[in-house]
């Protein structure tokens, strides 16, 4: 056998071992997308056929496969270019540049740890915009000297200057001008508008008693004498009408009939209390039960020395509800 033929046989043997023999050969299904059965003992993503040591060594030295030592780069035991699992792993690592230097330096250090995790996030959380708007941004809420748009809605205007609470356009001036002066305590304390139904409208001198818009007429105007005599009965008319309300001594009886009777007899305020009560009892037809109840309450008031209870019993007897209640 010639020297050239032996070199070709050695190269073919190395190629056949690298693609088929190995320690374990799985041929039941293809490993790559090309469909060609390949050895699964190592990754073949960078080359479909890994060259032997002899052929690669010959090419690296720039020599022809047929010249020089045909066994250059091969191991001494098999003369096939692979000695063990470690040598196959080294071959794989040398062909594609190495797993460690490629994946860890490229993926972990450059893109994961340094650029996007440590350097990237820190620049946006510690020293970036977040700090400008959170830590240094306290001037938006606590700095009273700020005059921009954010400061006008911040703490200084609403809390320190209190524009809308105590010292501003809608604050203290507003509360004094509208609720306090018009509807509040100043209105009742300073009756500047008494005659027109202002400050004491609903108190003792208001419009419904004898100081407001109906006040003067109430006592001496169109409703004057008739109202005082007929609806509130006599000398305690103002007290009965204003202090007791509308249901106590004011409209308890048929005021129209009483007014007609008094207008016909001409006895307005000229009768005594006994005469008036007797007439009221006659007009209203007090029942026997009310009379008995009035007697009992009157006696109880005398025993307990309670003048109000005595008066209440008298009112029940006569059918008249006193202006005192």
Curated annotation (Swiss-Prot):
What do the Gene Ontology cellular component annotations say?
Answer: cytosol; nucleus
Q: Which parts of the sequence are annotated with region: Disordered?
A: 1-325
Q: What is the official name of this protein in its record?
A: Uncharacterized protein C23H3.15c
**Residue ranges with Low complexity bias:** 200-210, 252-278
Bias (Polar residues) ranges: 1-21, 29-57, 114-167, 174-193
Q: Which organism is it from?
A: Schizosaccharomyces pombe (strain 972 / ATCC 24843)
- Sequence ranges of Basic and acidic residues compositional bias: 86-109, 282-325
Q: Which residues form the signal peptide?
A: none
Source species taxonomy: Eukaryota, Fungi, Dikarya, Ascomycota, Taphrinomycotina
